[in-house]
Amino acid sequence: MSDNQSWNSSGSEEDPETESGPPVERCGVLSKWTNYIHGWQDRWVVLKNNTLSYYKSEDETEYGCRGSICLSKAVITPHDFDECRFDISVNDSVWYLRAQDPEHRQQWVDAIEQHKTESGYGSESSLRRHGSMVSLVSGASGYSATSTSSFKKGHSLREKLAEMETFRDILCRQVDTLQKYFDVCADAVSKDELQRDKVVEDDEDDFPTTRSDGDFLHNTNGNKEKLFPHVTPKGINGIDFKGEAITFKATTAGILATLSHCIELMVKREESWQKRHDREVEKRRRVEEAYKNVMEELKKKPRFGGPDYEEGPNSLINEEEFFDAVEAALDRQDKIEEQSQSEKVRLHWPTSLPSGDTFSSVGTHRFVQKPYSRSSSMSSIDLVSASDDVHRFSSQVEEMVQNHMNYSLQDVGGDANWQLVVEEGEMKVYRREVEENGIVLDPLKATHAVKGVTGHEVCNYFWNVDVRNDWETTIENFHVVETLADNAIIVYQTHKRVWPASQRDVLYLSAIRKIPALTENDPETWIVCNFSVDHDSAPLNNRCVRAKINIAMICQTLVSPPEGDQEISRDNILCKITYVANVNPGGWAPASVLRAVAKREYPKFLKRFTSYVQEKTAGKPILF
């Protein structure tokens, strides 16, 4: 036992010269991909004790980490295209990280690899430490571990080992007996030699016998046996050498037989273990094959939420999967909106309208409407003319309004190449396919006719930001950046993210105008013109792709005379709507996806918005 302990102790010692120092700890700010809504966010990352942890900021480290992963079996993969990005994956968990520049990325990757190497999966010193622990355990447990595991079902082998212990004791006793015999013999020989030497010295003075050749010869032959009688060692006469020999032969034969039996048992055990090993190998082969098939299937499907599958120049998602993902996200938004609308209807309580004059607010501008009579006309509405409001974008607004009035109201026939994509009742949606540098710039034109509302009412609800969230379901948030005039504002708005497409934002000037009629037969016309501008208060940001728009909502009111002397009611009015949209979405969304989404969403928008205006104006005085 002492030998085993000493061997284990020596084997567990490590060479201090080859033992490397602990890996260096590291901390700093990295951009981490949080989710498809918020995208990349700066996080305080700490690399310590083979663990990578991240916090929301350096000041919040005392509140605990937001997440951590062990680097023992982590796979670090620098990105192929993004020189600042690297991914860390452990089983199904993947962290997407970005450094400030390629140099910082390499420093982080090297530090993480060093921690991973020293974690026990790849370090020679770690392998030595693990081996030493195994040897200590095996040396300390001895036969007890063997008897409780490998020999749990092999009692015959243990019995044979006990027999060999008995044979060893017999052989040891025989060796002790022989050793005693040899020791006594050695003592007897030593005493005999001393006695012989003494007798020879006493007889040196005796006369020698004279031979015929004159030489002298001592007469010792006749007295030799008398002088040196045969000495027999005392105390060994009781040894039965023949019996000991028989016992020795039987003992060795028993040892050989027992060893043979032990070998036979071990061979049988080895065959049993070999069969179990073969079965486990076959199971492992089947599992690995199934795992390989699953991984191949997973490679075919996008990892939802990962930055590699979002919109971008190096996106791994194909157009079909891109469209499926966008369509699924839009369906979810529609369901949420339906639930929200049903909840609003359930909680809605009608409010009474005050009698007398009705006031309608358009921004901060006020219109006063008197009850309409046959003697009155549309020009009886007191309106501050839009041309009286002058601001730094006035010339651009005038140009945009004139262009839309000249071109947007033209017929879709001729050489314009307008394609009818949707037709539902009075609503028709046309499109012209235009691409520039791979970006879809399809102009869209829709015509619609809505009963019971005026063009002024439709444009009022379309322009007024106070009611924007009541009918617009695609906006995440918005705010008025600057009020240029009573009828012109600059608005910044961000649209809801539809994964895997990038989030879009828009900065645009919105102006509402009444277009004077050139003749008595011309219908009353209102227009809302929205077009992109630049403003210092809303610069570009990395979270959103800035879209460029040029949109016009042109509404003409047609009145059919009532019968007799009756006043005009909503049954006598019809609003003819022309909606024109020129949108540059930017980014890298596939053209087929953008066209499919536009074909789906624009008709839904017109129906939803016009239904909202009809609902809000029902039962209210007409606003011409």
Curated annotation (Swiss-Prot):
Start-end of Polar residues biased regions: 1-11
Any stretches that span the bilayer, and where are they?
Answer: none
Per the entry, what this protein does is:
Shelters ceramides and diacylglycerol lipids inside its START domain and mediates the intracellular trafficking of ceramides and diacylglycerol lipids in a non-vesicular manner.
Kindly list the places in or outside the cell where this protein is found, as annotated in its UniProt entry.
Cytoplasm; Golgi apparatus; Endoplasmic reticulum
Q: What is known of its domains?
A: The START domain recognizes ceramides and diacylglycerol lipids, interacts with membranes, and mediates the intermembrane transfer of ceramides and diacylglycerol lipids. The PH domain targets the Golgi apparatus.
Gene name of this polypeptide: Cert1
Q: Which GO terms describe its molecular function?
A: ceramide binding; ceramide transfer activity; kinase activity
Family matches, as Gene3D superfamilies: 3.30.530.20, Pleckstrin-homology domain (PH domain)/Phosphotyrosine-binding domain (PTB)
Species lineage, top-down?
Eukaryota, Metazoa, Chordata, Craniata, Vertebrata
Which species?
Answer: Mus musculus
Its protein name is Ceramide transfer protein
Residues carrying Phosphotyrosine: Y372
Q: How does it assemble?
A: Interacts with VAPA and VAPB. Interaction with VAPB is less efficient than with VAPA. Interacts (via FFAT motif) with MOSPD2 (via MSP domain).
Q: Report the CDD domains cross-referenced here.
A: PH_GPBP, START_STARD11-like
